[in-house]
Amino acid sequence: FASLKSKQHSDMLMNLSEGQDNRVRRAIWNALRNYKNNNDVSTFLQNVVSTDSKYYSVSDAFRALVAVDTAAAGKKVEALLVRDSHQDVIRSAAISFFGSVKSDKNYNRLKELASYGGTTWDARPEAVSQLSKYAKEKSETVDIFVNLLEDRSRDVRRRAIYALASHGDKTHLGHLDEVMFKDPALGRDIRYAKKRILNPPKKPTKTPVEKKLEEANRKLDEIKRLLD
């Protein structure tokens, strides 16, 4: 039960969502991410995305759909990119598709979305974060982050700083110092990035399977707490 893998448990989760408040339903959508290639879960999540009136519920359901059925998610992404919502949570969820489903086409789309005017003010930071998923195989992405340190949006600059924290090196410390001088409000983020560059974290010892199981258990515990 803990790994949330059997069809019985997916049915239980979907049925459990009936009549629940939005917090519980969103926790269930997140738990359903574990049912990759499950047609029933895919159909269920597609229906939530298409019919739910709650912005955050739609956002979480779509992110879960990306994990469960990328083809189905791909058919909905364009419509969600033009759908307005509180703090642009739906548009941001749609943008996450291009980082979760890696391809040259999706990489180029993210570069467009991350550029100034590429999408709305609130959604652009998500495009920057998703671009960071390509940084290892496309080294030129790091240069994009450096250029974004001069962006007009502080949130975009902040995401670029965090991207450099993970993918930058000592040659980028000067760029970070320059941002610190121009915008001291980002000082905490810059100090974190510099510390991580100078002292990179050790690689995790947990296997992908162990991490996935741990995440599934965490989501189940969250649902139980919300229902108590």
Put a short name on every predicted segment.
Residues 10, 38-42, 74, 107, ...:
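Core helices of alpha-solenoid repeat scaffolds
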Residues 42-43, 54, 87, 120:
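Generic structural signal for alpha-helix starts
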Residues 137, 152, 162, 183, ...:
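Intrinsically disordered, low-complexity polar segments enriched in Ser/Thr/Pro and acidic
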Residues 1-6, 14-18, 23-37, 47, ...:
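Structural detector for internal amphipathic alpha-helices that build alpha-solenoid repeat scaffolds
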Residues 187, 191-228:
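Pro/Ala/Gly-rich low-complexity, hydrophilic intrinsically disordered segments
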Residues 144, 175-181, 208-216:
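Alpha-helical scaffold repeats of the Armadillo/HEAT/TPR superfamily
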Residues 44-47, 76-80, 208-211:
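Alpha-helical repeat scaffolds
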